[in-house]
């Protein structure tokens, strides 16, 4: 790991637990320079509320750190709030602040200031209440980086699950499983497992759409007409794709033992298993971006903000994964050079 590579951390919704997570994390030293892109005033006030003695070290374009902060301290690129934020109380006036932190982090990753960005949860509803159309981090960063197609992947120790479709009603899923979509998603998953995770020849298990993967066409024909022919074309490109497999048996130790990732057809086919296996220690990764972005797998938890009664496990895993991805990417760049 290059201990001089800087990483950006965005705390998300200022009334949620994101600022708390940043401060609690700062109690221990990180192996790299980690920069919170946040309001200094917000972090100072929340630290006082939590009873934490964290030294906030202001940094920015004029002076970036090139070594990790000591335990009990946190680098902060000050990004002012529009109005004061209070734990647990949403205010649409600060929607612009949230998006500014994401923009600074994303642009910093594009221009090389940061090796990766790690995001704490935002509150989509309050941003939309401010009159700003916002459907989530993923779509915002895709637009910021001019990326046409991105893929959502959640991961925990020992399991990665990517999705062909994401937040769709179940009744719309089958129509959305097209050969074109499946090809795009699989290619992105395969390419990023190689480029950002350092896996030379990824082994990907692919779920069927229907029960028993269609039971030879008796329980649905999508496997026969769309999924299998598409996988055959992709195998001809050199991809190691296993499936389509019945989802109820795919997620067993025997199948997963040598798998680098699972490709699920829809949200609730793959994510319940992952969250059962690693809830509180799982993360979200956006694949297909020209930058590295990882995130926690939970929400803003407004009721817990300022209480100190929160678990940093998901954020810690998101950080560790970002560090590993940056190291893999840096290693490939150096080899190419």
UniProtKB/Swiss-Prot annotation:
Keywords, sorted A to Z: Cobalt, Cytoplasm, Magnesium, Metal-binding, NAD, NADP, Oxidoreductase, Pyridoxine biosynthesis, Zinc
GO MF annotation list: 4-hydroxythreonine-4-phosphate dehydrogenase activity; cobalt ion binding; magnesium ion binding; NAD binding; zinc ion binding
Compartments, record wording: Cytoplasm
Signal peptide boundaries: none
Pathway assignment: Cofactor biosynthesis; pyridoxine 5'-phosphate biosynthesis; pyridoxine 5'-phosphate from D-erythrose 4-phosphate: step 4/5
Catalytic activity: 4-(phosphooxy)-L-threonine + NAD(+) = 3-amino-2-oxopropyl phosphate + CO2 + NADH
UniProt: a divalent metal cation binding residues: 167, 212, 267
Cofactor binding summary note: Binds 1 divalent metal cation per subunit. Can use ions such as Zn(2+), Mg(2+) or Co(2+).
Function: Catalyzes the NAD(P)-dependent oxidation of 4-(phosphooxy)-L-threonine (HTP) into 2-amino-3-oxo-4-(phosphooxy)butyric acid which spontaneously decarboxylates to form 3-amino-2-oxopropyl phosphate (AHAP).
Description of how the protein assembles with itself and partners: Homodimer.
Name this protein carries in UniProt: 4-hydroxythreonine-4-phosphate dehydrogenase
Source organism per UniProt: Ectopseudomonas mendocina (strain ymp) (Pseudomonas mendocina)
Gene that encodes the chain: pdxA
């Amino acid at each position: 790991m290059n201990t001089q590579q800087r990483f950006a951390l965005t705390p998300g919704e200022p009334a949620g637990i994101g600022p708390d997570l940043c401060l609690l994390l700062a109690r221990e030293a990180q192996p790299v320079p980690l920069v919170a892109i946040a309001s200094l005033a917000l972090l100072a006030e929340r630290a006082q509320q939590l009873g934490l003695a964290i030294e906030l070290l202001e940094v920015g374009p004029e002076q970036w750190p090139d070594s990790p902060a000591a335990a009990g301290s946190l680098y902060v690129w000050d990004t002012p709030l529009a109005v004061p934020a209070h734990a647990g109380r949403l205010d649409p006036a600060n929607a612009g602040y949230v998006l500014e932190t994401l923009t600074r982090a994303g642009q910093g990753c594009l221009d090389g200031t940061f090796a990766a960005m790690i995001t704490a949860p935002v509150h989509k509803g309050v941003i939309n209440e401010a009159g700003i159309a916002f459907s989530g981090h993923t779509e915002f960063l895709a637009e910021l980086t001019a990326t046409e197609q991105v893929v959502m992947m959640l991961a925990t120790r020992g399991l990665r699950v990517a999705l062909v479709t994401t937040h769709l009603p179940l009744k719309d899923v089958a129509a959305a499983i097209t050969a074109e979509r499946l090809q795009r998603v699989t290619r992105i998953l395969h390419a990023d497992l190689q480029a950002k995770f350092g896996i030379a020849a990824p082994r990907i298990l692919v779920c069927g759409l229907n029960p028993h993967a269609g039971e030879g066409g008796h329980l649905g024909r999508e496997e026969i007409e769309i999924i299998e022919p598409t996988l055959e074309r992709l195998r001809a490109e050199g991809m190691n794709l296993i499936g389509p497999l019945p989802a109820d048996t795919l997620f067993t130790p025997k199948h997963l033992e040598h798998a680098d990732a699972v490709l699920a057809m829809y949200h609730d086919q793959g994510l319940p298993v992952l969250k059962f296996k690693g809830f509180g220690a799982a993360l979200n990764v956006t694949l297909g971006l020209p930058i590295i972005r990882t995130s926690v797998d939970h929400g803003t938890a407004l009721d817990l903000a300022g209480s100190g009664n929160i678990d940093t496990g998901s954020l810690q895993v998101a950080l560790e994964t970002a560090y590993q991805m940056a190291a893999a990417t840096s290693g490939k760049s150096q080899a190419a050079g």
